């Protein structure tokens, strides 16, 4: 089967409409261009993100349905709450963004590492611009879990998460949802639904619903301090928002 895709020009940051994305493979929109931070930022502003395998050109996607979390309604499993009360992982924001991005790459098999050197560099540059943020989970002084993504107003576009210890990524998501919602964050984009996200309570929006939400939230700002470097949990206050 022949498919026709737009090739992005390296000279401009223009993308085709997300509504022209293919149904099969779901959401494939364009190829080419580059990974300049400006291009990636322009993509997220339109509900588009890069993802490609080791042997692929740069591919750009806008799938439907879209996996999302409503941070105001997120509820961790009781077992995760009990685990955190016992083990008291520390949780932070923007303490080790480059390390989180690196671990998100390294914890996957080599043939599945879409977070190549170019992608890691691009998100690192976006972090320097204050657009890419991370949540870290620590066991003592060791980084054992976390997530990172791009903030677009009151929408957070989650890119990847990792876990090197029991429940670490679940705790990262739990604390971030609470923190983000307290700062007027409205929606967390998880891109494509999978069994793990579904087990954590993710739901889906159609492309039309997601783009409508994006347009509504991207011009509204979260409260000041949301993405300042800070601690969300320490051994003296590991569960500040118990039932």
Swiss-Prot record:
It catalyses: N-terminal L-lysyl-[protein] + L-leucyl-tRNA(Leu) = N-terminal L-leucyl-L-lysyl-[protein] + tRNA(Leu) + H(+); N-terminal L-arginyl-[protein] + L-leucyl-tRNA(Leu) = N-terminal L-leucyl-L-arginyl-[protein] + tRNA(Leu) + H(+); L-phenylalanyl-tRNA(Phe) + an N-terminal L-alpha-aminoacyl-[protein] = an N-terminal L-phenylalanyl-L-alpha-aminoacyl-[protein] + tRNA(Phe). Its EC number is 2.3.2.6. One of its GO terms (cellular component) is cytoplasm. Keywords: Acyltransferase, Cytoplasm, Transferase. It is an enzyme of class 2 (transferase). GO terms for biological process: protein catabolic process. Coiled coil: none annotated. One of its GO terms (molecular function) is leucyl-tRNA--protein transferase activity. The keyword Cytoplasm applies. Gene3D superfamilies: Leucyl/phenylalanyl-tRNA-protein transferase, C-terminal domain, Leucyl/phenylalanyl-tRNA-protein transferase, N-terminal domain. It is found in: Cytoplasm. Signal peptide: none annotated. Pfam families: Leu_Phe_trans (PF03588). SUPFAM superfamilies: Acyl-CoA N-acyltransferases (Nat). HAMAP family: Leu_Phe_trans (MF_00688). Belongs to the L/F-transferase family. PANTHER family: LEUCYL/PHENYLALANYL-TRNA--PROTEIN TRANSFERASE, LEUCYL_PHENYLALANYL-TRNA--PROTEIN TRANSFERASE. Functions in the N-end rule pathway of protein degradation where it conjugates Leu, Phe and, less efficiently, Met from aminoacyl-tRNAs to the N-termini of proteins containing an N-terminal arginine or lysine. This is Leucyl/phenylalanyl-tRNA--protein transferase. The gene is aat.
């Amino acid at each position: 089967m022949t498919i026709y895709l737009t090739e992005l020009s390296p000279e401009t940051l223009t993308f085709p409409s997300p509504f022209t994305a293919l149904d099969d493979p779901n959401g494939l929109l364009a190829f080419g261009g580059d990974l300049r931070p400006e291009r990636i930022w322009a993509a997220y502003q339109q509900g588009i993100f890069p993802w490609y395998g080791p042997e692929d050109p740069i591919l750009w996607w806008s799938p439907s349905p879209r996996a999302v979390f409503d941070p105001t309604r997120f509820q961790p499993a009781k077992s995760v709450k009990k685990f955190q009360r016992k083990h008291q992982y520390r949780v932070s924001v923007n303490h080790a963004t480059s390390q989180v991005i690196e671990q998100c790459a390294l914890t996957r098999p080599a043939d599945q590492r879409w977070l190549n050197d170019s992608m890691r560099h691009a998100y690192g540059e976006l972090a320097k611009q204050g657009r890419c943020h991370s949540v870290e989970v620590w066991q003592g002084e060791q980084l054992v879990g976390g997530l990172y993504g791009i903030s677009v107003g009151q929408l957070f576009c989650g890119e990847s998460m990792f876990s090197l210890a029991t429940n670490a990524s679940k705790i990262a998501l739990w604390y971030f949802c609470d923190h983000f919602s307290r700062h007027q964050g409205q929606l967390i984009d998880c891109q494509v639904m999978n069994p793990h996200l579904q087990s954590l309570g993710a739901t889906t929006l159609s492309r039309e619903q997601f783009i409508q939400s994006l347009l509504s939230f991207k011009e509204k700002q979260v409260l000041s301090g949301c993405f300042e470097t800070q601690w969300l949990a320490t051994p003296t206050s590991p569960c500040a928002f118990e039932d």
